Amino acid sequence: MKKNPFKRILCIVIAAVMLCSVFASTAAAATKCACGHSPVVMISGFGATILSEKQEDGSLKRVFPPDTKEILKLLGVNAPDLVTGIIKLLAQKGTDGIEKPMREIITSIVEPLRMNDDGTSYYDIVPILSGAKNTSLEAFTKNDQLDLVPYTGSEFLDMEVIGDEIGDDHVFNFLYDWRLSHADVAAQLHDYLAEVCALTGHDKVSVYSISQGSLLLGTYMYEYPNDNYIDRAVFDTPLLAGSNLVSDLYTDKPLALNFDTTLDILRAILHTETDFSFVMDIIPADGANNIADYGLKSMVLPSVINIPAFWEMCDPENYEYIKSVRLDSVKNAKLIEKVEKVRNGFMSHISETLYAQQKKGVSVSIKACSGVPLASGTVDNSDGIVNMRYSCGAVCAPFGKTFPADYNQAVKTGKNNISPDRTVDLSTGYMPERTWVVNRHYHGQAEWDPRTYSLLMDLLLTDNIKDAYSHIEYPQFMESLSPTSDVVVLFKSTNSSFLPTLSKHLFSCNSVMVKNLSKKDKIKISSITSENGTLNFALPYPIVLEAGESAEIAFTGKVPATESYDKITVAYKRMTVTGKDATRDFGFTVTRSYSGVTKIDLTPAYIITAIRIAHDIRDILARIDAIFSFINGIK
């Protein structure tokens, strides 16, 4: 049969076009971005990604969390936000009158979260968006979907601020189904990071994770040790080894919420300085706990009891007991297998995993928070949500107490890793030299504390910070600067509650900085004292500080012969109609072995020598004067 030359020519042309297309796409994919900034991938925590249910026509319907307006509509109240709406409903109907409507509302809200006995989803649930190309800041903005970004305007680092630094097309938010086993989601993260690199023309990305998102990131690092997609990894208030809060909610024991902590966390989340203590005048603690316990056990747990991620987040001390009372070894065998893969994997090898990443060249950083009891009632040093020991591996004194005077650092690291208030020993931490601790700061809430926010941004976007001992602005142990902390006292030489000494007779500074942290109210400082008299503060009369204003207060005192602990107490009052007299304590340590940078370290050596000589001369003259006084007394 005679061949048609036209067909042959057409085939050659088509083949050539296809070949050129392949070369063009390969060249495009191989084009490297020379912007000088790694793309950033952000991983949020529990409940942050909006979940949706696939409909028969292929569309997605938002199911959790439901829109606030929908909840308020179900509540039957007109209010600007959910908290105000619930308070309004309580005021209208009282605790007895809201049981039925609340039961119906809560049940309908949590039902889409239901999972089967084997830990798979009962409904066809997926994140509301997925894929790198759909979850960049550029895509969120272009598609008018910024309201779908987790933690919009709260807690998380701000995507838009990062976008201003490195470009909207270089900032991504990994959305995921936070109910699933972290090992399963780690596989999705593995693919997602590869997508981001291909999309942006970069070999590596910087990853910022918070809370449960940090457990996911750690699990990914453990499950995919040969991946090389990451250059920097920041763990912000991470849930790494579990949390008593999750265990407290899953246990069969009565719930005993700490409402002071709960309300303070709520203030921080809402970024408000409003005092919510009036809520407890409406609902006594016992009544509120009974309501919460009843609601949790009868309305929430039936839908969420088989969620693998929750079981993976239980603390290690209570996991086996809670498993024995809540799960069936046969019926839930596959669920338990999923859970224990993660618990026996990354969660049992946290330090090894992080150091393996560091060995590959990844800059790993941890920011943890302390000084707050858990909201769920367990009395342990925490950020309100995650225990310190499970967040960063630290050993802590019993909550409300300090280590005894004869306590020695648990591990010799070559650094002083005991906090100045002697409540935290970070020497046992998962990675102590790359861990920063913020005292009295609540879980997440990066945007609510300017110094914490700045630290996280520097760790994520730069290599400026060598370790937790190398930067004067970011000492390893910091005090919260959030507005709801009211006031802070910091030694001028360290920006912390450590007071190093220069010699046997000389402190590294002779003043503290006292700052009003409120963004809107004046405060009156009436007194500053040290409990054991180590320091005497020069405050002869009360001072008034405007919102955000600082004052330098001088002190005198004799340098203790050995390392010494004391406590500064500030008496103050917010100058508002409802302002009350209040105090805030700051535990501090006078030490000769401070491991961080002091302002003295940044001062030229000849000036330090001159200061020491001047002090020695003053000391000699004082002794001579004392001798002459003694002689004159004999005469």
Which positions does each model-derived feature cover?
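Hydrophobic core
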Residues: 14-22
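Terminal low-complexity/disordered tails
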Residues: 28-36, 43-51, 294-507, 520-521, ...
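N-terminal non-catalytic accessory region
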Residues: 30-208, 214-269, 383-486, 600-609
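Short, solvent-exposed loop/turn segments enriched in Ser/Thr/Gly
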Residues: 504-512, 551-552, 560-571
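Asparagine-centered strand-capping/turn motif at beta-strand->loop junctions
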Residues: 514-519
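Short, hydrophobic/aromatic beta-strand segments
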Residues: 520-528
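Short, solvent-exposed loop/linker segments at beta-strand-coil boundaries, enriched for Pro/Gly
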Residues: 529-541
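Terminal connector regions
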Residues: 562-598
